[in-house]
Each structure stands twice: as C-alpha cells, then as structure tokens.
From Swiss-Prot:
Main subcellular localisation: cytoplasm
Gene3D superfamilies for the chain: 3.40.47.10
Protein's recorded name: Beta-ketoacyl-[acyl-carrier-protein] synthase III
Subunit (UniProt): Homodimer.
One of the record's GO molecular function terms: beta-ketoacyl-acyl-carrier-protein synthase III activity
Class in the EC hierarchy, top level: transferase
Origin species: Streptococcus thermophilus (strain ATCC BAA-491 / LMD-9)
Family as reported in the entry's similarity comment: Belongs to the thiolase-like superfamily. FabH family.
Catalytic activity: malonyl-[ACP] + acetyl-CoA + H(+) = 3-oxobutanoyl-[ACP] + CO2 + CoA
Keyword annotations: Acyltransferase, Cytoplasm, Fatty acid biosynthesis, Fatty acid metabolism, Lipid biosynthesis, Lipid metabolism, Multifunctional enzyme, Transferase
One Gene Ontology term from the biological process aspect of the record: fatty acid biosynthetic process
Stretches that traverse the bilayer: none
Job description of the protein: Catalyzes the condensation reaction of fatty acid synthesis by the addition to an acyl acceptor of two carbons from malonyl-ACP. Catalyzes the first condensation reaction which initiates fatty acid synthesis and may therefore play a role in governing the total rate of fatty acid production. Possesses both acetoacetyl-ACP synthase and acetyl transacylase activities. Its substrate specificity determines the biosynthesis of branched-chain and/or straight-chain of fatty acids.
C-alpha cells in the first residue's frame, strides 16, 4: 500500500517589512494597541510580487532542495484566497512557470484552513497509488485585498508563502485527520462582488475588501476548534508540537489551556509575519525545520491545524 510523507519544506516572504509603528503613520492605531491584542509586531508586504510569484519561489526551492526535475512532479496544489486572477489558477501559473509539464494543478480555497485541506487532499492522491510526487503550497498576497483605512482588519494580515514536497513512502506518516466546514457562519468575507448583468437591477454595491469579525473568529477558534483538536489528540495521542494557524497569540494561549497541553508545544511566528492565511502553517513549519526545532526524517509528530473563513477548520497529525 502506498503512503505519503513530507520530504522537503520551504518558505518565502517579500522583503518589505511593515512594523506596527509604520502602520500608526497611516491609520489610527499604535504598536501597543496591535501588539496587546494580537501579538503581531510586524508583517511582510509585497511591493510588486503577486501570489503566483511567491508560490513559484517556494516551488523552485522545493525542487532545488530535493534534486527533482519539474517533469517528475505529478501535481501542484496551491491553497489561497488571494489569487492573481479568477483564472488561471495560481497552481496553474506555478506549474507553467517551473515547467512541471506532467503535473496537473489546481487551487483550493478554504481561507486559513486551506493548507491543511490541500495537504489532506494531496495525501489521498498519493495514497491512491496513482501519483508519487507533488507540491502543496499555501500562498497569499493579502495586502491587495485590504482596506488600509480599516484598522480592525488591515493591521492583522501579511503576505507570504510556504510549502512542502509530498512523496510516496513505504511507511505511514499521516496518523490523524479532522476536516470540517460550517457554511452557515461565514465569519470572513473577501472581495464581495455585485451581481451585475444586463438583466439585473444594478442596485447591489460591491465591497472589494476583506472584512472579518475578529471576535466571532476568536470565539469560534477557542471553542469549536479547540474541541476538535482535543478530540483528535485524545484519539491519536499527543504530538511533539502543535503548529496552528497564526492568527493571534491570544488564541494560542487559550487553545493550550483548553486542550490541556503545555504552551511550550505551540510554535509561533505571527509576531514577524502577521496572519498570512493559507501560508501561515507552511511558513511556520519551514522556519522551524530551518532552526532545527523540527527535523525531517525523524520520528517527531506534529499537529497542523487551520481555522478561518467559511467557516472552515481542519487538523492533521503527521510524523515528519
């Protein structure tokens, strides 16, 4: 039987750093206001790179680290809510740019759960026995979706990308999974478009900017998501580390208490990146492999958990 494993990781973020103090010069906010409520100190903002550019950078890194040629890839999956265009997909742009001529490619839109949903999908593709190698990338340029006068939302987000190479393995590496959606509670809205045609009344006004009910998302995370994670941990055993979506430091603090796990097991980097939606978990994973907290090819187990707009939430327990 075929199994799947994460064999390489990589991440990339734009060079432009925007601090809380920088934001205080263009909107009514302060470093103390942002940091005390979110833990975020700075974020990366793209100046001219689009989502596919960030994702392509990660794809090239993964190929270089693995020594694979792009022709050896069977698929490219990209999780994003900020694509370059409605079509082609970001994944298709990446596939074409890197020359993965034998790979199929598509995007997954599940907001901050997107990378977990994409990784779970890719694991099933390899486990089917039909495919052997593929890239799973989370990439966002959320700065282009924000109303920069809306301090409640604009201060939270940043741009970046991260991803993994998933390959066939003789051993099981994915030990637990829980994927969920509640479409009756949106919570996050981005790029709402009016319904306009020659036959519509034309009265609906579009709002192109991302909007978020932060309190509702916080309550959802610490109640519903923590319960889901706790159930998975009780069933499959406690992992070595928890890599949760990087939305808010207070969510991590509360989650640890709710799940009854040491806070030290919850890795964090939103201080430097802000909320990068689908990119947050793979960036966190890649950074902690780079600093040797996590070691690929070891027996370490990690729990990856995303939660956000949709509402969506999902967790995987993976041996890396």
């Amino acid at each position: 039987m075929a199994f799947a494993k994460i064999s390489q990781v990589a991440h990339y973020a734009p060079a432009q750093v925007v601090t809380n103090d920088d934001l205080s010069k263009i909107m009514d906010t302060s470093d103390e206001w942002i940091r005390s409520r979110t833990g975020i100190q700075e974020r990366r903002i793209s100046l001219n790179e689009n989502t596919s550019d960030l994702a392509t950078n990660v794809a090239y890194q993964l190929l270089e680290k693995s020594g694979l040629s792009p022709e050896e890839l069977d698929f490219v999956l990209v999780a994003t809510i900020s694509p370059d265009n409605s079509m082609p997909s970001v994944a298709a742009r990446v596939q074409g740019t890197i020359g993965a001529v034998n790979a199929f490619a598509f995007d997954i839109t599940a907001a901050c759960s997107g990378f977990v949903f994409a990784l779970a999908t890719a694991e099933k593709l390899i486990k089917s026995g039909a495919y052997k190698k593929g890239l799973v990338i989370g990439a966002e340029v959320l700065s282009k979706t924000l109303d920069w006068s809306d301090r409640a939302t604009a201060v939270l987000f940043g741009d970046g990308a991260g991803g993994v190479l998933l390959e066939e393995s003789e051993e099981e590496h994915f030990f637990g999974e829980s994927l969920n959606t509640d479409g009756s509670k949106g919570g996050l809205e981005s790029g709402a478009s009016a319904v306009i045609s020659p036959y519509s009344d034309g009265t609906e006004q579009p709002n192109p900017y991302m909007q978020m009910d932060g309190k509702a998302i916080f309550d959802f995370a610490v109640k519903t998501v923590s319960k889901s994670i706790k159930a998975l941990v009780e069933e499959k055993g406690e992992p070595d580390y928890f890599l949760l979506h990087q939305a808010n430091i207070r969510i991590l603090d509360t989650m640890a208490k709710k799940i009854d796990v040491s806070r030290d097991k919850f890795l964090a980097n939103m201080m430097s990146y802000g909320n990068t939606s689908a990119a947050s978990i793979p960036i966190l994973l890649s950074e902690n492999v780079a600093n040797e907290t996590l070691k690929l090819g070891s027996d370490q187990t990690i729990l990856l958990s995303g939660f956000g707009g949709g509402l969506t939430w999902g967790s995987l327990i993976v041996k890396i």
